[in-house]
């Protein structure tokens, strides 16, 4: 059906992106949720309070997913490689669900329904919402939309385009494990070390590509490309994450808001440096962040196809 592997991959990536835009994540039976349950079951066997045990745990899961992806990509049939690439890309993306949740939190905060916004926030990030009021919920949601623009939108597309089904499924496995065990809590400080470091590596290039796209797309929401570059260069290194800081700083500068500060998780309170030098984010800024995130995903889809064509034999 298609003349070469690169055409197959390009078409599959675009179809997968379209599936995410149209359908989003299913409420039941999502492959990432199934993987998460399997990882939790395996943890009951592999858990030891040490880095080696954590590395074994991550290696088994990511290796299994990568082998599954390689097998799917090599099944016979002219249409199957496109279907496999499209399905894997769709499973790894989460842009539509991210935007939907961001808009729902915006709606709740505009109605001053803080309790409902608190209940919804954990579906977006791992923050402890119990002590957060409207401004804190707004900042937490905006920071999560920014960070997940890379994790759930741009980076999966780049891995799918550059290396195919095994890579994009392996990336989603790594990112899911980081969200499950990559914390500095007493239980996971050592066991989750490998997941956290591998996630840093897997997102390094993609996070910076995301920041570049934020700079380019900022005018769509009335944002400042110059402000995005300034905050990125000045503030990103202050963030405890080498990747989230890049994207969050770019969003802060583009939207002329100030992010960072006290950040409470269930296991600890982090006092983070500020990113950007604008105003405290308002609900309208959260809405702008959601729109910017979606535009960045569209830009990433174009970039992914360009990457496939550039790598063709």
Curated annotation (Swiss-Prot):
Pathway: Cofactor biosynthesis; adenosylcobalamin biosynthesis. It is a multi-pass membrane protein. HAMAP family: CobD_CbiB. Keywords: Cell membrane, Cobalamin biosynthesis, Membrane, Transmembrane, Transmembrane helix. GO terms for biological process: cobalamin biosynthetic process. Belongs to the CobD/CbiB family. The chain crosses the membrane at residues 52-72, 79-99, 154-174, 204-224, 289-309. This is Cobalamin biosynthesis protein CobD. One of its GO terms (cellular component) is plasma membrane. It is found in: Cell membrane. GO terms for molecular function: ABC-type vitamin B12 transporter activity; threonine-phosphate decarboxylase activity. Converts cobyric acid to cobinamide by the addition of aminopropanol on the F carboxylic group.
